[in-house]
Amino acid sequence: MNNRPELLAPAGDLEKMRFAIAYGADAVYLAGQRFGMRAAAANFDDDALRQGIAYAHARGVKCYITVNIMPSCRDLPELPAYLELLQDAGADALIVADVGVIRLAQKYAPKVPLHISTQTSILNHEAANFWADLGAERVVLARELSLEEIAEIRAKTPKTLEIEAFVHGAMCISYSGRCLISQYMTGRDANRGACAQPCRWNYTLMEEKRPGEYFPVEEDARGTYLYNSKDMCMIEHIPELVQAGVDSFKIEGRNKTAYYAACVTGAYRAAIDAYRADPAQYVMPQFCRDEVDKVSHREYYTGFYFGSEENGQHYGDSQYIREFEVVGMPVSCDADGHTVFALKNRFFNGEELELLQPGKTPYVFRVHGAVNDDGEALELFNVPQMRVHFTFPFPVDAYSILRKKKERPS
């Protein structure tokens, strides 16, 4: 049992990587402009890959590169040079799924460890051992497994084979992400990173002899969201994950914001550290749960970890829960607490805000004395990207974020 599991955070671009690292990630996973499963993310061009890997390594953080699409023949000619680039850049592992890609990786990037993607649907110890025999250093288990099943896999595989599992984020309604609905309906191939997420759309029924007449599946005029999964959240179950033998806790979300990366990474970092400090007396810090509730998310559940989940779908809508919003992202700060933020959403003088910083509980305060670049103390700050100056009674971290509870429509 590994009492210090790795915390693996998403890095959709260089900014998100920096925030994930600042808030406690042990490792980040990212993709180049090709061959990854999140084509909608900004991702990293070749120069940014080198820069990002160097940035992470300078801070003791590992970088895993996703090369986990299911490629066709036309994709293969570009792969050898790309794999050589990743090895030369210092990638700590390649996340792979297709056996053809694995074969090429072993030939063109032989020094880089292989992590077998969740796309391969590893559901049992024989499958895990197969990949270990093929040279894999780590397997990313299918999301469909229970903790009991993970513990059995851990017990029946070599201790040198690392086990990674998703602990937080969006769930695919299809089997471990292998879905053809998007390609069928929109021409966008989910298995090449371009999923249109039709599972989040609303649907109605049409009876064969009544064309054009649409019937809601439930008594809701919007239709019903038949395929719409809730989001996974295991923040309250750190001990169970550790005891099951999970070596790496993976957060989903390369398409999410830097704020999301900061909040969720920081919450899991604090929970893991609290558990490690005293496993026998561990109680999850309440602010950890509060933090994951303050990012944009769908209704949470625990996936399949505690057995077959009958309540994993949310039929009413596919909207995110957004109770908090970012007010400002950092521009500069100094040792005297003078901090400048770029405005993202409006706020009023006297309004309650929260300052989020790495490794600390949020600092709640009412705005007094904030000024613009001209030194004017406005009643309302509402110009996007305007620079707003605050003075705090303590030095503020360069990766701090300002937020507030969202205004309710009147």
Residue ranges with predicted function:
Residues I65-T66, V96, I116-T118:
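Short beta-strand elements of ligand-binding domains
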Residues A109:
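Conserved phosphotransfer cores of two-component systems
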Residues R38-H57:
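Glycine-rich, positively charged N-terminal anion/phosphate-binding segment
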Residues M1-A22, A27-L30, R34, G52, ...:
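Surface-exposed amphipathic alpha-helical tracts and adjacent flexible/coil segments at the periphery
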Residues G100-V101:
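Alpha-helix capping/helix-boundary segments
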